[in-house]
Amino acid sequence: MRQKTRLSNIFTISAIASGLLLAGCGEDGKDGVDGSVSGAGDVGQSVVASTTSGFSISKDAIFVAPDAVDGDDITEALSLALFDVPDDAVVVLPKGRFTVTESIVVNSASGLTLTGHGINETILDFSGSFGDDAFRFQGGSGITIRDLGVYEAPKNGIKATNVNGIHMTYTATVWEGELEENNGAYGLYPLKSQNVLMEHNYAYGSADAGIYVGQSENIVVRNNTAKKNVAGIEIENSSMADVYNNIAIGNSGGILAFDLPGLDKAYGGNVRIFNNQAYGNNADNVGAGVVGLVPPGTGMLILATSGVEIYDNQITDNDTTAVAITSYLLVDEDLGAYPANYGATMANGWSPTLKNVYLHNNTIARNGGNPTGDLLAPIAAGYGSNMNSKGSPQTFPAIMYDGIGELLSNVGQLAGFNALVGAEASADGVNYDPYDAGDLICANRNINANPAPEYDDVNTGLVYPTDPADITLVDGDGNPQPHLLIDQMVNNTYLNCTQPRLAPAVVNFKNKIYGCTGDDLAEAACAL
């Protein structure tokens, strides 16, 4: 074979926010939700106000522009309050909608709580700002941002980099109006951080990802709503992440897990995506870069990320597919150029292939009726013609696996990449050997919820066979061609295997444990 292989407005924000607040108020104030996590309301302090989520504000807090009225510019007061802020400070923003005209940068804060009076009660308008980020937290530990909304940031809403312990809750990032390419990129944006807790947030209108966690470890993303972003929720090059009880609606892609090349943290893994609702994610993709390749109409997309478990989700009404599982070879098919273009990042463990992805017990309905987007266009055309394994036009598979990386590994065509892998990554199991049982992509016990007879059966698609013995279509040079295999999802033949369950993510925030082994131990989703 040659080295080069070619592959031919459902809710208003008020309604959403009200739902989030109601969900949060039933937690009995237990630590890790709205109890003592942020340090306010301790015994001996006088409570002077409460946010709409029930967080208590004491008289000892630092109050920013307390006499401000709607439309006032509070930039200077906010900057002064957060400059060299004391440890464990609670900084309170006023009620109303206010303008901020520059990026607010906070360096190395410890134990800081920045709070408004509610997700709809305190709104900061950055439409006239001269900085890229609305808020940027650099370094520090034990930082909480809560009960406020950041609107119209020039680039990113709330960015936190190199923070150990970051909690964003009851917070909104919004670009009003239609989803457009000149909207800001990221809404809620923790990066290169540890112990990341994202809950009860709302993200709307990002031209990249509404809720994004990148190059981080120990992550819980729960009870959030992402609407009309390019990517609703994205976990990128991150390890030990639980994404559960979220709603992704009206985005281009609902929930994404990516490993991209060239980043400081070369790869992630152990990502669990469960008990989410991903429906109607059919917005036009106005994004740039790799996220701009996400096909509109994608419920979930797993791109070059190994160690992912997707289960007990409801994935419905997405025009292209419910779940697409793809190697990076769909993005860049030129294998011969990989050593030159990606050799350094491959040495650190990044791989264009993906392994150990397990989908089970998901409820899937009404997906694949109108596939769009360049990334899957040739594949969609094949399934929609007579060129697939059934020989007649088919609805695009609800679960689609490209299979090409696994096939090339199994025939030995990627074996030369082993020489690129550094010692540390190799010791962590990164390799290009033929797949063994623990590497397989598996899908079973998923539920066909299509209302018969109006819709066809939900199907599983395998673009390339993964067993070299099953290759029947090759080009003149002996390269395998897409076989476009398709099978029913229930009682399926393709991808019919199982994998061990992944470990829960654990967030340690201010010496309290969050997630399915901590404050959510009794949560129904955590027992699935």
Where are these regions (language model features)?
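Bacterial signal peptide processing site
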Residues: 26-28
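Right-handed parallel beta-helix/beta-spiral solenoid domain characteristic of secreted/periplasmic
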Residues: 58, 63-76, 111-155, 177
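Right-handed parallel beta-helix
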Residues: 111, 115-120, 141-152, 164-177, ...
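Extracellular beta-strand/beta-solenoid scaffold signature
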Residues: 78-79, 101, 126-136, 152-159, ...
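Right-handed parallel beta-helix/beta-solenoid
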Residues: 36-79, 97
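C-terminal motif of bacterial Sec signal peptides marking the signal peptidase cleavage site
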Residues: 21-24
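N-terminal extracellular ligand-recognition/capping segment immediately after the signal peptide
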Residues: 68-73, 87-112, 119-128, 492-493, ...
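Short, T/G/N/S-enriched strand-turn elements that build extracellular solenoid repeat scaffolds
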Residues: 78-84, 99-108, 114, 124-125, ...
